[in-house]
Amino acid sequence: MSITNATISQRAKKWLEDDRIFIDTETTGLGDDAEIVEICLIDSAGFIMLNTLVKPTKPIPAEATAIHGITDEMVMYAPTWKDIHGAVASLFFEYGFVIYNADYDTRLIYQTAKLYGLENDGFCYFLNERSACAMMLYAEYRGEPGRFKGYKWHKLVDAAAHEGVSVEGKAHRALADCRMTLGIIDALAKGGAA
């Protein structure tokens, strides 16, 4: 194992030892008006801390439903972001987050919180600072040159397949994606597949 990959392995182990929470969201889209429609948080042992659909403020576009399968009917009686914001914030402050593509999910958490006037609390302020990006760690581990911070980014399902992590459930659903992220970090902590 190279010195770089040994360091990456140590960082992955630290995330697991620190009992970080692994988080994933599904959303209404990619833009500045997108919001969260599903969120899952699991601990480093895979225990589900929170797994819920989230009722958005506007209809879910067909393009988003085509990716994650979440429909307006499914979220009709789900809690709103305002209902779960406190629980998510509490887990964040207690454990910190590991997210595959942290920039995206933290932006969507902020955008969704802002819709309810919750963007100015300490949670949203510290979100980027205390969220570790599993995608960036994996990109560094693979070491393939790319245009994003010097490394090629890998899709979650591709990274999971490369590391021998099976998909439990449907990819592009928050619980399955959390489990894949945890599996990738666990594989890196053990030295990775390559």
From Swiss-Prot:
Q: Name one Pfam family in it.
A: RNase_T
Q: Which GO terms describe its molecular function?
A: 3'-5' exonuclease activity; nucleic acid binding
Q: Which UniProt keywords apply?
A: Exonuclease, Hydrolase, Nuclease
Q: What's the domain of life for this entry?
A: Viruses
Q: Does the keyword Hydrolase apply?
A: yes
PANTHER family linked to this entry? DNA POLYMERASE III SUBUNIT EPSILON, PROTEIN NEN2
Protein name as annotated = Uncharacterized exonuclease CP81
